[in-house]
Amino acid sequence: MAYQLQEINRRIQKDPVEFLAECDESYAQRVSLAADRILSNLERSPIVLLSGPSGSGKTTTAMKIAEELRRRGVNSHAVAMDNYFLTQDPKTAPRTPEGAIDYESPLCLDMELLDRHFAALARGEEILIPKFEFARQMRNDSMGLPLRLEKNEIAIFEGIHALNDDIAGRHPQAAKLYISARSNINEGSVLRFKGTWMRLTRRAVRDYSFRGTEVARTLDMWANVRRGEKLYISPFKSKADIIFDSSLPYEVPVMKHYALPILQSVPEDNERRGELLDLVKAFDHFQAIDPALVARDSLLREFIGGGSYQYH
């Protein structure tokens, strides 16, 4: 699917408030359809596995699906699989071809603990969800949170490796979702903004604003992120019961406000500056939208802040 640039700019000029509301409603309908599929699977399993590449909005989407399920009377919990990361020993950690620790590898996850927790939840037993401290790059089980599923309760586990065979393959009855910002933006038949650029922009803005990461560092990591997607995430997309497009037609016009200043600050000697310049120029095609118009519960708030959901 591709959005049309002319239509986006026309809607912004005509009535940006109405445009944003319609886009958010379309996203809400996708959430509702996902909830339908999950409920139809509840008798088979209380576990939902939600996967997708970096910058897809997995966290917000998991929380919104859980919210929709609760609205329908089914208590639900969103669980970040990032908390199941293992504390890495530099001597045994998986490595990229360049020799750095490969944080995109599924070997960084505690697969055995996840396996035990899924089985325990399905039996109605209590588990202790671990806590991974990213600032210290270590797991702290003493900060874990208890979770037990009562009858007809659901746990949504979201993470980049949720559909990996070593996870989903061991629990084939679980409902499975794959999410990504998949839609390009075209001007007629000419590509103006790639879906992968949307995800890179989301991540760059979030990392800069909330993780203290300079955009040059995000760009340096992006090549390995994309390599990890092709090796560890995309091959399992076909396992999903639902493919969920998390792109929003209004996000590029909003992101102009946040992304352009930080993208333009990247040093000229950065090896990815060529692609970066293409991305910077692409924003010129879009009318801007005031970020204040973005709803507090919008998925975009996961990346720009000021939202009604709490992110850890």
Where are the language model's segments positioned?
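Glycine-rich phosphate-binding loop used to anchor ATP phosphates in small-molecule kinases
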Residues: 115-173, 222-236
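Post-Walker A helix-loop "phosphate-sensing" segment adjacent to the P-loop in P-loop NTPases
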Residues: 67-77
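Conserved NTP phosphate-binding and transfer environment spanning the P-loop NTPase/kinase superfamily
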Residues: 16-21, 28, 162-312
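Conserved nucleotide-sensing/catalytic segment adjacent to the nucleotide-binding pocket
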Residues: 77-79, 86-136
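Hydrophobic anchor at the beta1->P-loop junction of P-loop NTPases
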Residues: 48-50
